[in-house]
Amino acid sequence: MSVLKKDSTSEKRTQLESILEERNNKLTQLFWLSRLNELKSGGDLQSVRQELAEFLVQNDLTKNLTFDISSLRTYRPQEPPMDRRPLRSKSSTPLENGTINRKREDAEPHMEETRKRLREHIIPEEDDDREHEQRPVKLQKVGLSHDEELPKRLEPPTIPIRKISSAGDNQETGSVIGEKKSEQPVSTSRNRPIHTQLSTNPFYQHMDISTLRAEPTPVEVKRKRNYIIDEIIKTQSKSTDTSDSHSTAGGRDSVYLVMKETVPSKLARAIPLSELKYVSQTLPLIRLIPPTHKALTTDLYNTALNEGRITVVSSRIEELRRLNLWSLRQPKKFLDPWRQKQPSTHRGYMLEEARWMREDFHEFKKFKVSVCAVNSKAIMDYWKYGKACCIKRRSISHLQKSVNEVQEADTLGNIDDLLNKISDKKLAGMIEEQKKVIAVDAKLSSSKIAPSEEIHAPHIWEDPLDELDEQGCKPIFKTYMSYNGVSPLEKTILEDLPIYKGILDEQAAEDNSVPFVPISKSTVLLDDDYFMKLIEKDIVDDEPSFVALSKRRGMFYGNRRSHYLKPPSAPALRYLKFRTPTIWSPEDDQELVKNINQYAYNWDLIGALVSSSNGRSYISNIERRTPWQCFERFVQLNEKFSVHDMKGPRANAAQMWLYEAHKLQQQQKRRISPLGVGSESIQRGHRRLRWATMFEAMRKTIKKRENAPRPNPSQPRKPLDVKSAAVPTPAEMSELKAQRDETLRREGQMRRAAKQRIHLAQLQQQQQRVQQDVVQQRPQSRSQPDPPLSQQIPRVQSPRPQQPLAQQLIEDKGKLLPGVSVSAPTSKEASNNGKNLMALRQVQSSPVNGDLQKATAQVPPRGPNKPLTEKEIIESYARKIIAQKPDFTPELALKAAESYYQNVTLKQNTIGKQIVSQPLSAATVSTPPSNGRAVHKIRSPTPQEILQRIQQKKNDS
């Protein structure tokens, strides 16, 4: 351990020495940089090195001295001397050049004298331990006049003075010869004459002004340049100046876009959907494409197809607007609960806990399996290698009971008595046995296994699987893992192996908010054939102006409104006199204008947004923000508002309301229109007015309550008119219910009978019309020269005797209903009913009923005729069939007419039976009971019977 400590201390010492050496090198470099001017001017190196040694001693870190920046000199770069040779003029003559050179030679010795005098006046700067020298630096401008150059050249050097600030830093104040002056002293020196300037300076009193000679002013001839190049340079300089000023002064951000040359740099103007629909309907592109004389491209056809799609979409939008299904509000963005940072629901918390419990149970199960595997492996090693694989432990001392008694006797002080009782032989035997056990344990614990020697298991039992264990396979399960127990290859793999952490909250937030970067900043297509152009665009976040939304270019030309002003529903005019004016602050007006620009005169939405800022507090009348009040305030704010700009179904009502409000405002002194106030007009805004309105409403309510009529306590109260009626018994209740059911049944029967009479009357009218048509057709058939159909066609034997149909119906009814004469119709009515039914069936199912209806519409009705026989009806049917289908033979036509007649008669008989049976059921009903008190004769119906009656009524109706 001592060797390791020595090695560590030596390593630390070498590191510290290297750090200190590097620090000293840096300080030395800083020192030489501060004395760079002296080295260039050829100063004394020995003195500079001594100062360097002192500087390093002052900033020695081993002596706990930190670096002090004031110990360094401030470095002042020396400007290179300008060329004093004046520019030669192109038009100068050799004579002038000679005079100029001669004057310069005469002036040089005088200048040297003045410099010497100036150097004598320089006072060296004294510091605490060292001196700082400052050499003068001469500046000369080419092309300066003598008046400007002379005072600058003869300015005396000022003495730099160092002052120690409160923070301990030395600040150098002063100036050196050659430093540039500000513009103000130069301008003052120009205005004053040279002699006054020189006399005011104290350094010029030692010099003779007459010795100073003026140098000639160099003359520069203007060079000829091309005017085209000058204009290009001027425009470029102006553009750069404007761009710089625009980027810096305006403070606006700009974006540089790289795009194709064919792509338009400006966005296309937005056209309203109504204008697109109007243009597509009046002048569609699909009609203009075929007559074109130039070449047609795919883009033209795509444009025409897009126009059709726009038309379909706009019509669908208009349909949804009419149905109030087109919302102007954007639905709220769906937040995925999985991506939220915290589970907001109970189910989310339960899932999170279940996820951790699953991981905990799974890992704990694996840990138990690994512990069991390790324990089983340890047991196998113990039985295989013996106690050599066990850890070192203290040996177990097996003591008998007598020894324990000896120990107890020692503690109690009775050892002498116990030793006398135990014999010396037993005690000696016990001690020898204990020594043997201790020797055996020590031998087992001290036995070690050499790493080179092989360990053989005792031959207790042989296992054939022991040969596989010779390969020395690693254990499957491990309860721990160390980094040193891994191979180098596995270490490199583990360094790059990603650790599964699940979906973190930060990653979910990053996935949700994807940053938007213009594609032109990161991607440039190299295999593109087009030229690229660079465009600079300003990012303007200004809100649209108030006037910009109210006016726009027309649908085709001129100025029209971009959104027609559709006012909301106006309130009733009868409440106009009692109207309270609303108060609008500047903040409310600003919010109103912003919402109008954003939602384009959707007054319901604007009113909801403006009134939502009030919250759930009390809202007085002066603070209400209904859609109409927002519209009224908008009319006041917009100076260019005109009544004719309003469109829509509510425009007339709004115009009338505004006219009446203006008229009423002129008649009375009280204000009813909205009032705009500022923070300076009413203290604390309009809160005072709000509370005043509250107290006014309370005062009115109290006054109304006081004026309300009160009950007179002296008047006795009228007793309640309660009719004393006896409670009916169950028998009476059942009787009343039976009477009610009977009346309802009678009313139903009467309704059905009335319907049947109306139906029979209609059938009778139709039968008369059919008979008239048949009578009209009979003389036409006789006037024809052809022989009658009875001579051509043999008579067909009918299945029943030839008698009128009415008589047959009467006989059938008499057979079916013998003895019924109360409610059954008479024989005359029955015959009429049968005729009506037969006529109706003939009209509905005969093949020529269309021609008969046409004939009846033209011929006026005649008097009553004889009823037709069965033979005549069959022959008339046969003639109609032959007229419609000439291909049929007379025999076939007679057979078809006879079968058709039989079917019609069967249907008429069934209908007649149904008609006769209904009055019969009404007649057989017994008379209802009287309203007397004969309760014993009436049986109360059971609930089941009542339900059956209700169902029967539903079926009948």
Swiss-Prot record:
Its main location: nucleus. GO terms for biological process: chromatin organization; DNA repair; protein-containing complex assembly. InterPro entries: Homeodomain-like_sf, HSA_dom, SANT/Myb. One of its GO terms (cellular component) is NuA4 histone acetyltransferase complex. PROSITE patterns: HSA, MYB_LIKE. Residues 334-409 form the HSA domain. Residues 102-115, 734-750 have a biased composition (Basic and acidic residues). The keyword Transport does not apply. Residues 72-115, 160-196, 703-804, 922-957 are annotated as: Disordered. Residues 762-792 have a biased composition (Low complexity). It is found in: Nucleus. Keywords: Activator, Chromatin regulator, DNA damage, DNA repair, Nucleus, Transcription, Transcription regulation. Residues 89-100, 184-196 have a biased composition (Polar residues). Residues 576-638 form the Myb-like domain. One of its GO terms (molecular function) is chromatin binding. Component of the NuA4 histone acetyltransferase complex which is involved in transcriptional activation of selected genes principally by acetylation of nucleosomal histone H4 and H2A. The NuA4 complex is also involved in DNA repair. Belongs to the EAF1 family. Component of the NuA4 histone acetyltransferase complex. This is Chromatin modification-related protein EAF1.
